[in-house]
């Protein structure tokens, strides 16, 4: 599976980076290898085969690769190989733009490190500060968190940074956007000089790449060409709906197709998510929804339900577009086309994870045609009109 990905993806990469074709060749700790195989990996994906070794060597790394190609496992394996488990102090700090992603990364680190007795805590807003303090005082090898809460814990001196040797910026394009930029700089200033920095994202626009110069020293770059970025094995379609008002009926017509496996429907605003959820329920369709204004507990419960397959159709904002991995999702619908073309790949990458087949359907009004063309041009891709037999493809 991962071999196919390796063959099909061409990387624009620093000169001295060789691909390693198996996890055994990486000289990883025995207990870590056990965790990797137990997690279901057999051979490394394109980004894993190149980046893991460089991270283990202690090099600063900038890695850009498609959604669903195992980027989280790439830096998690690098961390687990590099930390000293006999020192129960924070040695690796992972920053993510959303709480859900921070928790998911924590789960990946714990799963891969299952045989290593690794301590990893998710330090995120919307949860108990007291619990964070207790966990951090106990000692955590790895902290996965959102910038606001991590900054708070460092300032309170509960998150001690003296032994931190690795900083990971996941979904770096979002993290280095205006919203988080200052917090990231603040956190970086608290870290020991010479901290290794790993920057990871599916999209790394030029301005973000330039900004990474502030954090990195002579980084190894592992970059996928932009025209390689639309996802292998993902079918992309559009439905011409002419007017905004016609989208709802179109979605109702598609509902039976949505529930064949699991589907995610993206809207551009929280209000739209609430409105569409209510309309669908009034029409007797079963849906769940999630956005950033919901309390963390509620968001966790909804995610849990969706992961377990108890709910099959999730309506949400872009909060869900960032790296959330639910294996059964094979259909993504852009009820609204994303306002930011970089988010397109994050959204459609929710289907067809790690090389499974997936389908993305874009609802396009007359006003949206220009945005669709822009997305096609940006990713050098062609988005066709949806065929009648869409149910056979999901």
Swiss-Prot record:
Its EC number is 3.6.4.13. It catalyses: ATP + H2O = ADP + phosphate + H(+). One of its GO terms (biological process) is nuclear mRNA surveillance of spliceosomal pre-mRNA splicing. Pfam families: DEAD, Helicase_C. InterPro entries: DEAD/DEAH_box_helicase_dom, Helicase_ATP-bd, Helicase_C-like, P-loop_NTPase, RNA-helicase_DEAD-box_CS, RNA_helicase_DEAD_Q_motif. A motif (DEAD box) lies at residues 170-173. CDD domains: DEADc_EIF4AIII_DDX48, SF2_C_DEAD. It comes from the Eukaryota. Its main location: nucleus. Keywords: ATP-binding, Helicase, Hydrolase, Nucleotide-binding, Nucleus, Phosphoprotein, Ribosome biogenesis, RNA-binding, rRNA processing. Residues 52-222 form the Helicase ATP-binding domain. The Q motif is unique to and characteristic of the DEAD box family of RNA helicases and controls ATP binding and hydrolysis. ATP-dependent RNA helicase involved in 40S ribosomal subunit biogenesis. Required for the processing and cleavage of 35S pre-rRNA at sites A0, A1, and A2, leading to mature 18S rRNA. This is ATP-dependent RNA helicase fal1. The gene is tif412.
């Amino acid at each position: 599976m991962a071999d196919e990905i390796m063959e099909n993806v061409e990387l624009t990469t620093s000169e001295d980076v060789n691909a390693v074709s198996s996890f055994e060749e990486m000289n990883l700790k025995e207990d870590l290898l056990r965790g990797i195989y137990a997690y279901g990996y057999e051979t490394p994906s394109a980004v894993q085969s190149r980046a893991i070794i460089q991270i283990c060597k202690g090099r600063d790394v900038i890695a850009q690769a498609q959604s669903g190609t195992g980027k989280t496992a790439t830096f998690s394996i690098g961390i687990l190989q590099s930390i000293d488990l006999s020192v129960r102090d924070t040695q690796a700090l992972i920053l993510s733009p959303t709480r859900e992603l921070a928790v998911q990364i924590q789960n990946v680190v714990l799963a891969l490190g299952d045989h290593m007795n690794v301590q990893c805590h998710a330090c995120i807003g919307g949860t108990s500060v007291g619990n964070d303090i207790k966990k951090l005082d106990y000692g955590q090898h790895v902290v996965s968190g959102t910038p606001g809460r991590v900054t708070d814990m460092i300032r309170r001196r509960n998150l001690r940074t003296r032994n931190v040797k690795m900083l990971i910026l996941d979904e770096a394009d979002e993290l280095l956007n205006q919203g988080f930029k200052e917090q990231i700089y603040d956190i970086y200033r608290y870290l020991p000089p010479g901290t290794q920095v790993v920057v990871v994202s599916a999209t790394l626009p030029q301005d973000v790449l330039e900004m990474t110069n502030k954090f990195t020293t002579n980084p190894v770059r592992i970059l996928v060409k932009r025209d390689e970025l639309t996802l292998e094995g993902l079918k992309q379609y559009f439905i011409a709906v002419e007017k905004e008002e016609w989208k709802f009926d179109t979605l109702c017509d598609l509902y039976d197709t949505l529930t064949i496996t699991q589907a995610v429907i993206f809207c551009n605003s929280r209000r739209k998510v609430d409105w569409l959820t209510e309309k669908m329920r009034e029409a007797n369709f079963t849906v769940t929804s999630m956005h950033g204004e919901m309390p963390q507990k509620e968001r966790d419960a909804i995610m849990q339900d969706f992961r377990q397959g108890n709910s099959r159709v999730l309506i949400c904002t872009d909060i869900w577009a960032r790296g959330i991995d639910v294996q059964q999702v094979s259909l993504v619908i852009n009820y609204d086309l994303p306002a930011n073309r970089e988010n397109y790949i994050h959204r459609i990458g929710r289907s067809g994870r790690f090389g499974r087949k997936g389908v993305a359907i874009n609802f396009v009004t007359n006003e949206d045609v220009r945005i669709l063309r822009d997305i096609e041009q940006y990713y050098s891709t062609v988005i066709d009109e949806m065929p009648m037999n869409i149910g056979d493809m999901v």
